[in-house]
């Protein structure tokens, strides 16, 4: 899989109409781990496993499902759901200095860095909610 930075917007929003209830939300951009996603309802960030679960990932798209008792019911005038990707800035693979070259692992690592670059672009080009990214960048030690 290859992530095309120009074709990848790591943010999607949904409007749940007044009185309607929705429990599943499509994540139409690639992510790797459940913790890569932020889920907001009317501007309030929800907690993974407490308010929602994630299916998919591993470099693919997926779905966020609300947990029991946490479905999104449209408030007066509707409710807004926003899903963003926020991949922790970290190198997760270490390649040995000898042995077989691991092309698939290298491609996954490069896809992660491309996704991180896309997340940073989103930080500067989209309205809130977008918390998390700057607070997770490593300090200069």
Predicted regions and their residues:
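Single conserved hydrophobic/aromatic residue that forms the stacking wall/gate
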Residues: 124-127, 131-141
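N-terminal assembly/attachment segments of tailed bacteriophage virion structural proteins
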Residues: 1-110
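Compositionally biased low-complexity segments at domain edges in trafficked proteins
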Residues: 111-126
């Amino acid at each position: 899989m290859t992530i095309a930075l120009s074709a990848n917007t790591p943010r999607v929003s949904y409007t749940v109409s007044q009185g309607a209830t929705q429990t599943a939300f499509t994540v139409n951009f690639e992510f790797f781990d459940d913790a890569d996603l932020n889920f907001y309802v009317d501007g309030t960030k929800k907690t993974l496993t407490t308010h929602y679960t994630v299916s998919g990932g591993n470099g693919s798209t997926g779905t966020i499902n609300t947990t029991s008792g946490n479905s999104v019911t449209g408030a007066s005038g509707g409710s807004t759901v926003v899903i963003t990707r926020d991949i922790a800035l970290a190198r997760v693979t270490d390649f040995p200095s000898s042995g077989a070259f691991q092309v698939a692992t290298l491609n996954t690592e490069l896809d992660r860095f491309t996704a991180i670059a896309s997340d940073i672009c989103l930080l500067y080009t989209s309205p809130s909610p977008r918390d998390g990214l700057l607070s997770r960048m490593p300090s200069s030690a």
